Structures are given as structure tokens and as C-alpha cells.
Amino acid sequence: MSTYVNDMWPGSPQEKDSPSTSRSGGSSRLSSRSRSRSFSRSSRSHSRVSSRFSSRSRCRRSRSRSRSRRRHQRKYRRYSRSYSRSRSRSRNRRYRERRYGFSRRYYRSPSRSRSRSRSRSRGRSYCGRAYAIARGQRYYGFGRTVYPEEHSRWRDRSRTRSRSRTPFRLSEKERMELLEIAKANAAKALGTTSIDLPASLRTVPVAKETSRGIGVSSNGAKPEVSILGLSEQNFQKANCQIMWVCSVLVDKVFIQTIRCLTGTCPSFLKRGIFMRDSTDGPKVMHRWESFVYSCKYCLGYVKMRFFRHSN
């Protein structure tokens, strides 16, 4: 019994040499090795993850720094561009005011609004728009297309819808209708039944022209007919016009005579005019002869034009 107990005592040599104790020692060594390996693996994985996180954080920091730098650069560029644009606009404004004489009210800085930003994004400023409108062109929308106006001035614009440049004329029938409408409106406004028209608005019976120039009025009376088929009043007006034309021609002849005598006449009168004669061929007329010839030609034209129906 004692031997069995002594053999099984923890300090006995049998226990040291027993196979059970050797197996348990090997398993403990293996477990410690596996633990160390797993710990090293976990530490490695943790270090890898930490390195990844640190690299990501570094990338994020660098990206944020680069973004901030870009924003700062963009802001600086924006300010520099706006400054250069403002300087160029002021130069263009001064040049246009000096060259074309435009007032400063066309170039007032407008209020900051959506339209201003849109127009600037399209590459056009308010100065260009005001300059184009001042030159007679107009923008439609926010595009870059410029359409010239049909009429450059407001005086050329007709109040009617017709686009013809000839003035609008009324016929005699339309004038009579408008006169009757005006008479009715005036009578209604004044509360009377009849209105006496002034002499300038009274209608004159128009004579119908015939082959011989003699006309018959609408009421059957035969109007007075004189030279050129005109009435007495119209003939007096035509006679006044003829006298005015003759006086203008006489003034021109007198001025030309003075110029020839003083030597300040044109060069073709100094050199003379080549005239073709039927017998002697071409000959050169003296300046005085050419002047007399031109005067005779003018007077003959006046006589032929205005006095051929006098007889």
C-alpha cells in the first residue's frame, strides 16, 4: 500500500517516466504554440487593419486638403477674373462713350438677379446688350443671336400694320367718309343738328377729264379751263412755281457769270467744251461761248417745258 502510494506521489520518478505525463506535456506545448501563432496572426491582422485605416485617413486628409486648395484657387481665380472683366468693361465703356457719345445710363450696373447670372454664364454682359439696343439691334431671350430691328428710329415706324415705306394715302371717297363721321361726332358732342364746315374743309366738285382736257363737274356745270387744262386758281399756283424756277435759274446764271469773270469757274469751263459741229467737225468752244451756250440751253428748256401750251 505504501509502495503504491509512494509510486503515485507527485514527486516519484515513476510519474516522471510515465507515458501519460509525457503526453500531457506535449499537448500543453502544442496549445501554447497555437496560441502564440493565433495571437501573432491576430496582431498581424490588427496591424494590417490599422495600417489600412491609417492610410485611408491619410488619403482622406490629403483629399480634403487638395479640395480646400482647389476651392481657394477657384475662389482666387474667380475674383481675379471678375476683376479683369470689370477692368475690361470699364475700358470698353470709356471707349464707346468717347467714340459714339453714349450716355452713362446705358451702362448702369444692374441689380444682382437671376437674369444677370444667366446672361453672364452665356458669355454676354449687360453692356453688350445696351450697346446693341443703342445701335438698333435687339436680343431675344438669353441666347447669343442678335436680330436687327426693322426700323431704326421710332419716326420711321408706321402706325398701321403695313410694312411699306411709302406714306399711307387716303382716297377721296375715304376722306369724305371720315369727314362725315367727324361731322356726326362733332354734332353729337355739341348737341346741334348741323355744323357749318370751314372753307378749308368744304368739298370742291372734281371735274372728269376728257380727251381734249375739258372737264364736266358732277353737277353738270362746265368749269373754267385755261392753260395746261388747269383751273384759274391752280394756274396761278403753277405760274408762281414757274416764276420761282425762273428766278432760281437767273440766280444761277448770274452766279456763273460772276465766277467766269473772276476766274473762279470750274476747270471744264476754263479748258473749254468739245462740241460737235455738222460741217466743220469737232471744235473747241471758248469758256465764254460755252457759258452762253449753257444759258441758252437752260432758257430754251424752261420755255419748252412751261410755255409750249400758252398759245
Swiss-Prot record:
- Compositionally biased region (Basic residues): 32-123
Q: Give the domain of life.
A: Eukaryota
Gene Ontology process terms (BP): spliceosomal complex assembly
Record's compositionally biased regions (Low complexity): 20-31
Using the record's annotations, give every residue carrying the modification Phosphoserine: S12, S109, S111
GO cellular component annotations, sorted alphabetically?
Answer: nucleus
Keywords attached to this entry: Methylation, Nucleus, Phosphoprotein
Subcellular localization is given as: Nucleus
InterPro entries referenced in this protein's UniProt entry, alphabetically: RSRP1
Report residue spans for region: Disordered.
1-125
According to the UniProt record, list the residues that bear Omega-N-methylarginine.
Answer: R135
Please outline how this chain is modified post-translation. Phosphorylated. Phosphorylation at Ser-109 and Ser-111 mediates the interaction with spliceosome proteins.
Entries under Pfam families matching the protein: RSRP
- What is this protein for, i.e. what is its function? Probably acts as a spliceosomal factor that contributes to spliceosome assembly and regulates the isoform switching of proteins such as PARP6.
Which PANTHER family is this protein grouped with?
Answer: ARGININE/SERINE-RICH PROTEIN 1 (PTHR47622), ARGININE_SERINE-RICH PROTEIN 1 (PTHR47622:SF1)
Family according to the record: Belongs to the RSRP family.
Protein name according to UniProt: Arginine/serine-rich protein 1
Please name the source species.
Answer: Pongo abelii
Gene name, per UniProt, is RSRP1
